[in-house]
Every structure is written in C-alpha cells, then in structure tokens.
Amino acid sequence: MKNSKSRFTLGFVLACAAITFSLAVCAHAQTVTFVYDFHASGQQSSALSVIQGTDGNLYGVAAGGAYNQGQIFQMTPTGELTTIYSFCSQPNCADGEGQEPMPILGSDGNLYGVATFGGNATGSGTFYKLTPAGQFTKLYTFCSAPGCADGQWPHGFIQGRDGNFYGTTESGGANNSGALYQLSPSGGFKVLYSFCSLPKCIDGGTSNIIQGIDGKFYGTAGKGTLGGGYLYQIARDGSFNMLYNFCLYTDVNCTSGSYPSPLVQDAKGNFFGTTAYGGVNGGGTVFEITPNYQFHMLHGFGVHNQASDPIFGITLANDGNLYGTSVDYGYDGGRLFEVTPKGVYTELYSFQCCYDPFWKPPFQATNGLLYGTTLYGPGTCCYGTIFSLENGISPLVETVPVAGKVGQSVLILGNGLTGSTSVTFNGVAAKFTVESDTYIKVAVPKGATTGIVSVATPSGTLNSNPQFVVTK
C-alpha cells in the first residue's frame, strides 16, 4: 500500500521563548513524523498501537480488513503497510473479530493475541497465534464454560516467566464481572481469580496486568473502597491483595486522581501510571507508587490551555523518562508529553484538531523511536495515523521474554546486530547466534544475575530496556 508521510519538526534548543508552542522545559529538538495515514492510503481504518517483530518490522491490529471485522498488519519502519490476516476469515467468525487488544511477540517468535468478539455463538472472543508466515491458529474460545465462568470479552494479556499467557476479561467469571486467567501455549486454560469476589464488589473492574519483578501480577481497576479505582496484586496461586485505593474525582481534595491506567514498573520496583481525572488540577495525574505502596504525584494535569485527561497510561523509555498522550477533551486533538521520574514535565507535541491519540501509550522500538497512533487523521479527519517521535533517545535491544531461568532460550531484538561480538547478562558472557540483522538467539548463561543485557555490535554497545530478571 502506498505510504503517506508528513513531518513536523520542533527545532528548539535554547531559544524556546521565540517559539509559539507551550513547553514546560526546553531540551533537544523533537521530531514527530506521521509515518502512515490510513485515509490517504485509501483505508477506512485506524490502528490501536504497534509492536516490533523479529524481522524489525512493526505489527498491529486495526479496523477494516477483507471482511471489515478487523485486521492484523505489518508495517516497515519506512511506512509500507501490509495486511497479513483479516478476522472473520473463518465461517461464523470462529476466528474472532475486533481491532483490539494488541498482539504481543511470544518467546517463540510468533505473534499471540486476543480478539474481543466472535469465536462462538456468544461472540465472547478468542485467543490466537499467528506465525511470521501468516498461519493463524485459534488456541481458545472464551465463554466455552457454562455461564461464561472462563471469562468473556478479553482485555490485554502478557506472557509470563513460565511461558504461559496471563490476561483479564471484561465480563464472565464466577461473578460475571471479569476474570484473570492462565492459558498455556498449547491451549490449556484455567481461571486464577474472578473479580467482584469481595463484599460490595470493591474488587470489581478489570484492566491490563503486568508481572512484577517479584513474579506476582499487578493491575489497576475501577471501584475500590473509595470508588476511584485501585491497585491490586494477584499471586500465581490466585490469592488477591488490594494494595492502594484511588479517590473519586468528585470528592474534595482528590489529589491522587481517579481511574488509573495500566502500570509500568522500573528496576527498583516502583510503579508508574496515570489517572484519567482528578488530581490537584482536576485533569488527571502521572503518579509513582513505591514498593511499599506509597503514592507520589509526579505531575497534575488540567491547568488552563495545557494537557488533560491522560487516560491511556505511559511508557518507560530507556532514557529513564515517562512518555504518554492526553486526550484534552473539549480543547484540541490531544498532546504528546514527557515526565521525568522527578516530575519535570515537557509537552512534546500538540496534535491538531481531529487527530486524538488512541488507546495506548507510545511504544518504544529498538531504534530508539517512540511509535503511537491516532484515532483520526489530517484533512478530512476521517481515519487514523501511525506516528513516530524522535527525541534523541539512544537505540537499544529488547529481550523476549524479559525474565527467565539459566539455560532458557531468549530472543534479543535490535538493529545492526550482524557482526555482534558478545552478549552479556549483567556482565556474564553468553553463547549466542546472530539470526539476522534484527534479532539474536541466546541462552541465559550460568552465573547470570538480574540486570542489563548488553550486545556489542560493530557500531557500539546496545543495552536492554527493561532489565532482564533471572529467575530460579
């Protein structure tokens, strides 16, 4: 498909006062490039987000496709987009339908994903595998158990340290309020926790989860004891703990904000996220929650003519800073922003009317660029775009998975890997094979400990983000 690209460069270094953009901090130049425009390319579509494959290309899901029920696409770094699978290719949409959530790259190099709808007569969604060659396999159909006790309408998911997949559903489960499930690569399924199991359903609501550095699962959801959402922990045995409660934004002095986004975690065990509303200025927050569950607000949104409503969460990039987007309901097309761990805020880009950043924070590729999507695009404002941000961030490598035992096989994604001379896990040398210029296969070496994975390439050393956790 023909690529449509437009470029906006914000060339400010020190003379920020001479530029009309409203910026909190002056720094190096940023470049936002609209890499792909669905409308200009003749597609009535918009994408949710993108991820990186072993071939260095970006993959995602979008509306449209051959049957107008969603598609999985591949996009080159230069913006050439190809549909590799259209949902509802099977009779009665047995393969699933929908344009969310995002697929992930599995430790075997295949894409894994969930389709929110379709699959069976209840239309409750599916879990699938897609090979690089485009071979589609349905691994599970939700609402296969009586009363949808296995969950209905899946959200996002992760691949755990044990190789199994873990995710949540919007509905179903024992209490018809969603469930956290485990699914093996071969399709073996079990529910670990059914939400709304506590009195008055204070544990209601579901969202995406992460696996913490301690191996337990963490997520955020609505409700809670104060009504504004909560942070929870679920162990692999299904035991549940409510760790922090957010206030309701309509309450006086709701400084923590309400309705938290999915989380990210740094190497020290701190959690970072956003709240959609509330906070000191009423327009949401970027927050940090420490390992002992102490809350710190890093930035409050909602000041007049500035960003507000950062409902999609944030990305922790390898420069140590947090990147996200805001919706700015009623003002403009949203903003792209950066917040340091110390709370220093920078507005990087203001989207024009009708753009609207989509439902995910930016994704960092191994070339150092951050990629994101918009719901709408320029001109007729009908369909979406995929954009990139160049912010002077160094290239990196990514490990898949991000944790594993000694001897376990790991994929290392990157760029310019041909001719690499060493791979180390926190300083311990590993045996490796360069499969292509964009990925390496390696086994976790004996003696390795949790820390950074480094690859010595002909152009310099590349380090991993996040750190690799060595498990027992």
Which residues make up each language-model segment?
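Extracellular beta-propeller repeat domains
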Residues: 2-472
